[in-house]
Amino acid sequence: ADASSVQIRVDPNNEWIEIEDDGIGMSVEDLNGKYLRVGYRRRDEDAEHGCKTARGRPVMGRKGLGKLSLFSIADVIEVQSAKNGGKHGFRMTAPDIKKAVQDKRRYHPESLADDALTVTQGTKLVLHEIKRQRLGKGVAALRKRLARRFSVIGQANGFEIKIDGRPISATDRGDLPKVQFLWTFEGYEPEASTIAHVVERESLPAR
């Protein structure tokens, strides 16, 4: 998405989750040909950028399957995106997808009405009918998982993730205070405050 900021809002009653970025957004063609297409191989099929985004970031993901993981925590997914002055959106539901598979027919998401589109820049996902048992221990656990998953979070990388207005940082990982010996790849610089206690540190050549 080439976003510099991702905002995550979690309903206190776990009725919905919103994820909104300020990236480049998607056109109707992008939504149909890339987002909705399972198995889209960006590295091979994006002739303009390939393995790098427009901002020069390494592309994440492999098989175009990550989008399906949303259905592990919610049965209804709304996708809204804005690009080049146009806004578009649709709704997908797990029961309708299963029914289409059973009937051996192609599934078509439900288009969102123009007055239902609230996105102004980038892409917005809204999850409904949350599977509460999959949320684990709530927001605290989500912060830890995201901090451990994305090493690019932080001002040094020009990328932030906020949950309910509070930025995620390396301290949310929860594991660095236990580290005595640290090896990092060249180009990655942990926040100084998180590694002040490290006994020995070494930088390895970039992969």
Segments (PLM) and residue ranges:
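GHKL/Bergerat-fold ATPase module in large chromosome/replication-associated machines
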Residues: 159-207
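Surface loops and adjacent helix of pleckstrin homology
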Residues: 82, 130, 172-174
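Short, well-ordered alpha-helical segments in soluble proteins
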Residues: 34, 42, 149-150, 159, ...
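Short linear motifs in intrinsically disordered
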Residues: 7-8, 68-71, 143-154, 199-205
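Short glycine-/acidic-enriched loop or helix-start segments at secondary-structure transitions
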Residues: 89, 136, 172-173
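GHKL (Bergerat-fold) ATPase N-terminal catalytic module, capturing the glycine-rich phosphate-binding loop
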Residues: 1-124
